[in-house]
Amino acid sequence: DGRLKAPGKLSSLTPEYGQCAGSNQSPVNLSGLVKADLAPLQFHYQAGGKTLVNNGHTVQVNYAPGSTLELDGMHFELKQFHFHAPSENLIEGRSYPLEGHLVHANDKGELAVVAVMFEPGQANGALSQAWQVLPAKAGEIHAFKEPISAEQLLPAQHDYYRFSGSLTTPPCLEGVRWLVMKEPVQASQAQIDAFKAVMHHPNNRPVQPLNGRLVLE
């Protein structure tokens, strides 16, 4: 699977990797930060995590309809969240041991991804619940007894960095609104290690060039 063996050379593999050689790719090293009057993010989340799937390149929680993010005067519905270890994005050169991506879409199909950095510390409530049924093998899918709330993945402060980027896995679709939380959240080292154990390999795409894109804060 090329996604696992050559995450940095996705564009050269097959046609479905179409935009992976584009100039607005993710992840990035968030640097050269530009002060901007970014509107506060408005999260309207409810407990909606239904199933947990190991798709071979991440572990993903699929979310029931009804949880939204208000951004740019539009409602973006939370579709799923998943994880990367180590982090894909860097904040001024700093890597974190784990990064969560909360993937949202509006009714036009436009995407907004909220990225949350994890640092070792206290156990995270959402991960405690999810990892009880952590699927060990690619293709496994497990249902939760009780729905999980993505709100437990968010930091207390919702200050963020913003840039325009892409999906970090094929087809590397560009035009994605990226919102990277400034404040990290905590996960226990055991939680981080459990994710890494089922992945068997780092699942972060290498940092892509900014190519003149601005990172707003």
Which role does the model predict for each range below?
Residues 1-217:
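Alpha-carbonic anhydrase
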